[in-house]
Design a protein with these regions (language model features):
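Divalent-metal-activated hydrolytic enzyme cores
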Residues: 1-29, 61-63, 73-78, 93-148
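Conserved beta-strand-loop surface patch within small alpha/beta domains used
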Residues: 17-69
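Homeobox/homeodomain signature
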Residues: 4, 46, 83-84, 132
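Ordered, amphipathic secondary-structure segments that act as subunit-interaction surfaces
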Residues: 78-88
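Short glycine-rich anion-binding loops that position phosphate/pyrophosphate groups of nucleotides
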Residues: 38-39, 89-91
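Residue-level detector of family-conserved "landmark" positions at structurally sensitive sites
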Residues: 53, 85, 146-147
Length: 148
């Protein structure tokens, strides 16, 4: 059985046993967390459980157009009032450059036409975290009553 089959089977079992007890789509803690995709960290390490918060993940915990879209949907359609940005202190994007990532992709695929155009590699975690918060706090579509 493949890893994908294992995950699908676990999801089917969960759906059968928890189907009627699913939490509502609006997060109970009115919180949206913008987080890195690090597989080593569970949301439970934050004291957050299923139904508490929207967890929006990507490489580096970067506020990209797509993650911003998710945060706006979280706020305007699902009533979150607080946004949190969490970066990992040993983030993989701190150990690579844009050029290195492009070269790896090109070497593996043979194509120079690489998407996404940017991977947003960075060197300093604190500076990156401040930059992500600045993007959110100054965005014209995020109201001033949203806390960070």
């Amino acid at each position: 059985m493949s890893v994908i089959d294992d995950v699908l089977e676990a999801n089917e079992l969960y759906s059968r046993t928890h189907g009627l007890r699913r939490p509502p789509p609006r997060p109970a803690r009115k919180l949206a967390i913008r987080k890195c995709m690090d597989a080593r960290r569970s949301i439970r390490t934050l004291g957050v459980t299923t139904g508490d918060a929207h967890i929006i993940r990507n490489a580096g915990g970067i506020v990209t157009d797509d993650s911003l879209r998710s945060l706006l949907v979280s706020h305007y359609l699902l009533d979150t009032e607080r946004f949190m940005v969490i970066n990992r202190t040993d983030c993989g994007l701190m150990h690579a450059s844009e050029e290195e990532l492009r070269t790896r992709i090109q070497n593996r695929t043979g194509t120079a036409d690489i998407a996404p155009a940017f991977f947003f590699a960075f060197q300093h975690i604190e500076e990156n975290g401040r930059h992500q918060l600045q993007i959110l706090s100054t965005h014209p579509c995020i109201p001033t009553d949203v806390s960070f």
